[in-house]
Structures are given as structure tokens and as C-alpha cells.
């Protein structure tokens, strides 16, 4: 039996993690975000009602679940308050269900200004960030000048620290990027207005998780973005600024690494990517348009159209290695309904003609890579909403089996629609 279960993306994000976390938290006592910020976009559909969460863990809709934002998350006070208000307007008592680590770095207005100024300065070489200040906030954390939630307990000292760090960043904004400075007093006033709300939710997360482990409570760790966007293991520099892999759980929450019991990798039945960066199986034809339209592939956070392509088992195998995956959840299988044939990338052909079955690390090394495909028959029958494996077409079952063979990991959950009920749980992670 696994008490501590990690749910993370195995591709470039947007795999459908939010729905699965929401589904599995029916048995959990706690749900923990351990990295990223409000650049995530987790969409839940419950009884036909759609909820998009960016910062608050997906377990917040569950009455008996406590949601926790761990120290690995960069926290925007304004984004958090906006999301809390939207949920409270729907009658969800967020403040009774949400806890924060005092070590969460804060994202403030100058981080957003820096993020956007840098992307503009990069021009054609822009990374494609969400423009929400995530990267600059992590930079401040590593440079040891960042402000954290815990700093808000001493408001006078916070004001002094804020002034010092803003002088540093405003100098850069004005003199290097040639944009307006960010107003110190406005930033201070905005944060002070909600400081007591934030500090009122602070808890020692590491100790809480250790006590939960000793009691045998079920805990879900919710990843954001995807493995191939990891700052170390992704397609650098076209990556996010945090560790999106299973290793980020320990550093981003304070859970001891030996206590992770099961790692569930969410894998979309095809591939998507938002923003710039390598994407060997990207499709520019009518099939790519079909996947985008049928899958409604537009970012929950930015609204940007996602790039689409065939499933890449080479990249997925890298995710298996890095995360020591216990099992997969296959999502959006129904999007492939109606295609005469489906393809899976099984290897890459390098510019010099070599065939390889592992991914490069640096983005430049991906240039000129050609995907080598295995083609399989598609299916005309609908898989949408199917809740039993026996109800799936034979061709769809063969597709599932081939993914398992190529990756060496069992598919324990199959999602056939956006609602939490449109799911087959073949093996429950908490029982594995």
C-alpha cells in the first residue's frame, strides 16, 4: 500500500494532471503542490462544472482534504487571493482547507516586469514564458535575496528588505531594459493588505507530512508542468524554472525521499507543447489540426494554442528513467477516435544517419532530429466516456499495450473524458 503518491506530467505539461489528482484525492487527507507557481493550469470538470486552478492544489474542491502549498512553489500573493476569492464566491471555504509553507518565495510585481522585459528583449529567441514572474522569482531565491511568506511576520523588516531588492531590480529595468521602474509603495501596500491572511495559513509543512506518514494518512503530491520542462532534465533552455520531476517532491515539500511510495506519470495519448523548444513529432498537417480541435488544445493559463504531434515514446522513456515511474495514467484517448491510423515515435534519426533511442539534453542537440514512427491501425468507435476496459475497441487496446511495451511501465488508469467519472482505475496507486 502506498501512502505518499506523486502525480506528475511525463511530457511538456498539459497532460491532464488536475483531473487525476482531483479523482484520486477522494481517498487522500492532504494534497501538496511542491514546485512551480501560477504558471500551471489544472482544469477540473465535476458534474459538468469547469474549474481552472493555477496555484491552489486540485484537492481544494474536496470537503475533507487539506491542500498545501509547499516551499518549492513560488507564490504570487495577488494570484492566490484572486483564486481564493473565485472559489469562495462559489461557496468553497478555502481558508479552512489551505495551508502554506513559510519558506515559499513570493512573486511580486517587479518579477513580472522583469519576465516580460526579458522575453521582449530576446525577440525571436524568446523562450515562451507565461510572463508571470516565475523565473525571476526563482532567481531571487537562488541568489538569496528573495522575500518569503515567513518574512511577512515582521512587517517592518519586510519593508526594508523589499526596498533593497527593488532598488536592485529597478536599476536593471530602467538602465538595461529601458522600461519603467516598478513603484515600491504600491508593491508594499498591496502585500501588507493581505499579509495577515497569508501568515494565518502558515504551517511547518515538513513536520506535518512526517506526522501524516506516521499516522498512515494518504498524501497526494501534485506536480505542475511536465518532466520535459524540468530545469535540469528538460529541453534546456526551453524549460521552466523548477524541478518538475519526482525528485522535486523531497526538496519542494520537506518529505523524506525514502517515503515516496508510488509515482504516477500522466501521459497524453498524443503529444503537445506550448511555446518554443524542440518537438520532434510535431505535426503541421491536417492531423495536427485535428488533434488541436478535438483535444481543445489551448492553454488553461495563457490561452495559447498548443503545438500538437504524435506520441513520442523516446521522450516518455526518459521520463520513466528520471522519475522511476510506478505506473501511467493515459489521458485523452478519445481524441484519437476517428483516425484511420495512429503513430508512435519509437526512435530518432540523427543528422548523421544514426538511430538513437534516448533524448538529447541541450536544445541545440535536438536540431535535425527526425522521428522514426511505428504505424498502427486507428479506430472508428467512440471511446469517450467508456468506463470499462472491455468497452474499448481492439485497436485502442493494442495502442495501449504497445505503449506499455515500449516504456516498460503499466497503464494503471485510463481517462476517456474530462469529468472525474469518465475514468477507468485498473490499479489504484494507494493500493499498489
Swiss-Prot record:
Cofactor note: Binds 1 Mg(2+) ion per subunit.
Any one Gene Ontology molecular-function term assigned to this protein's record: GTP binding
Binding site for IMP: 14-17, 39-42, 130, 144, 225, 240, 304
CC cofactor: Mg(2+)
Binding site for Mg(2+): 14, 41
PROSITE patterns xref list: ADENYLOSUCCIN_SYN_1, ADENYLOSUCCIN_SYN_2
Annotated pathway: Purine metabolism; AMP biosynthesis via de novo pathway; AMP from IMP: step 1/2
Superkingdom assignment: Bacteria
Keyword Translocase in annotation: no
EC code(s) of this entry: 6.3.4.4
Keyword Kinase: no
Signal sequence bounds: none
Catalytic site positions: 14 (proton acceptor), 42 (proton donor)
Main function: Plays an important role in the de novo pathway of purine nucleotide biosynthesis. Catalyzes the first committed step in the biosynthesis of AMP from IMP.
Family per record: Belongs to the adenylosuccinate synthetase family.
Record text on subunit structure and interactions: Homodimer.
Name used for this protein in its record: Adenylosuccinate synthetase
Species, as recorded: Salmonella arizonae (strain ATCC BAA-731 / CDC346-86 / RSK2980)
Amino acid at each position: 500500500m502506498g501512502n505518499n503518491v506523486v502525480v506528475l506530467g511525463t511530457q511538456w505539461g498539459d497532460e491532464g494532471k488536475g483531473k487525476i489528482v482531483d479523482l484520486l484525492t477522494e481517498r487522500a487527507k492532504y494534497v501538496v503542490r511542491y514546485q512551480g507557481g501560477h504558471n500551471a493550469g489544472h482544469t477540473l470538470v465535476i458534474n459538468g462544472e469547469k474549474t481552472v486552478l493555477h496555484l491552489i492544489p486540485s484537492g481544494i474542491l474536496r470537503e475533507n482534504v487539506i491542500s498545501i502549498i509547499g516551499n518549492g512553489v513560488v507564490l504570487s500573493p495577488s494570484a492566490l487571493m484572486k483564486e481564493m476569492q473565485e472559489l469562495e464566491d462559489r461557496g468553497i471555504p478555502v481558508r479552512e482547507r489551505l495551508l502554506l509553507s513559510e519558506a515559499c518565495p513570493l512573486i511580486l510585481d517587479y518579477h513580472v516586469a522583469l519576465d516580460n522585459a526579458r522575453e521582449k528583449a530576446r525577440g525571436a529567441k524568446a523562450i515562451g514564458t507565461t510572463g508571470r514572474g516565475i523565473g525571476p522569482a526563482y532567481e531571487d531565491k537562488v541568489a538569496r535575496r528573495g522575500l518569503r511568506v515567513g518574512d511577512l511576520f515582521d512587517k517592518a523588516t519586510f519593508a526594508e528588505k523589499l526596498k533593497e531588492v527593488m532598488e536592485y531590480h529597478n536599476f536593471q529595468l530602467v538602465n538595461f531594459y529601458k522600461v519603467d521602474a516598478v513603484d515600491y509603495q504600491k508593491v508594499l501596500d498591496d502585500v501588507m493588505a493581505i499579509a495577515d491572511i497569508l501568515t494565518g495559513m502558515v504551517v511547518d509543512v515538513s513536520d506535518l507530512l512526517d506526522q501524516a506518514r506516521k499516522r498512515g494518512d494518504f498524501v497526494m503530491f501534485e506536480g505542475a508542468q511536465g518532466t520535459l520542462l524540468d530545469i535540469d532534465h528538460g529541453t534546456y533552455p526551453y524549460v521552466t524554472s523548477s524541478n518538475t520531476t519526482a525528485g522535486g517532491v523531497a526538496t519542494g515539500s520537506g518529505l523524506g525521499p525514502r517515503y515516496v511510495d508510488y509515482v504516477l506519470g500522466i501521459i497524453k495519448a498524443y503529444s503537445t507543447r506550448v511555446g518554443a523548444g524542440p518537438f520532434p513529432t510535431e505535426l503541421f498537417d491536417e492531423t495536427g489540426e485535428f488533434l488541436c480541435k478535438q483535444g481543445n488544445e489551448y492553454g488553461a493559463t495563457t490561452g495559447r494554442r498548443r503545438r500538437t504531434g504524435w506520441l513520442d515514446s523516446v521522450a516518455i522513456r526518459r521520463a520513466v528513467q528520471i522519475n522511476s515511474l510506478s505506473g501511467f495514467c493515459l489521458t485523452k484517448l478519445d481524441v484519437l477516435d476517428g483516425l484511420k491510423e495512429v503513430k508512435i515515435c519509437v526512435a530518432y534519426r540523427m543528422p548523421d544517419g544514426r538511430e538513437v533511442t534516448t533524448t538529447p539534453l541541450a536544445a541545440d542537440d535536438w536540431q535535425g532530429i527526425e522521428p522514426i514512427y511505428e504505424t498502427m491501425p486507428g479506430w472508428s468507435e467512440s471511446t469517450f466516456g467508456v468506463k470499462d476496459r472491455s468497452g474499448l475497441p481492439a485497436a485502442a487496446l493494442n495502442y495501449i499495450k504497445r505503449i506499455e511495451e515500449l516504456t516498460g511501465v503499466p497503464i494503471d488508469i485510463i481517462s476517456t473524458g474530462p469529468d472525474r467519472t469518465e475514468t477507468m482505475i485498473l490499479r489504484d496507486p494507494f493500493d499498489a
